[in-house]
Amino acid sequence: YATCASVNDVICHGFPGKYVLQDGDIVTIDMVVNLNGWLADSAWSYAVGQVTPEAQHLLDVTKTSLYKGIELAVIGNRIGDISNAIQTYAEGEGLSVVREFIGHGIGEKMHEEPQVPHYGPPHRGPRLKEGMVITIEPMLNIG
């Protein structure tokens, strides 16, 4: 699997290239690991040097929205509970949720059911069950 490096306004799945990171950039590293046929997917965004206050706000709110979603990822809750927690927090902080890319189930395949959007009403979608493995990958925009 590829390691993706997305810089600044590239939301996700960017590929490493010849661009040299500059002070003030944001870079997101997205990696997939295969261990004995089971996949793991992780992405994290980093500030390069000093970023603007607006960019730092984006990083901080995205991280907090991830943890707000994780807090609701418990057996018996629904996917929509996670989705709504992310959207509610992000929009309350003046950011918008990217709707073109979502989280997903993961296991022996990279993209499995259920889909995990980062927006939508609570109490909807599949119930979380023991043994279910999902990715929660909030992607937010300024404005």
Q: How would you name each of these model-derived features?
A:
Residues Y1-G143:
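Active-site neighborhoods and metal-handling regions in enzymes and metal-associated proteins
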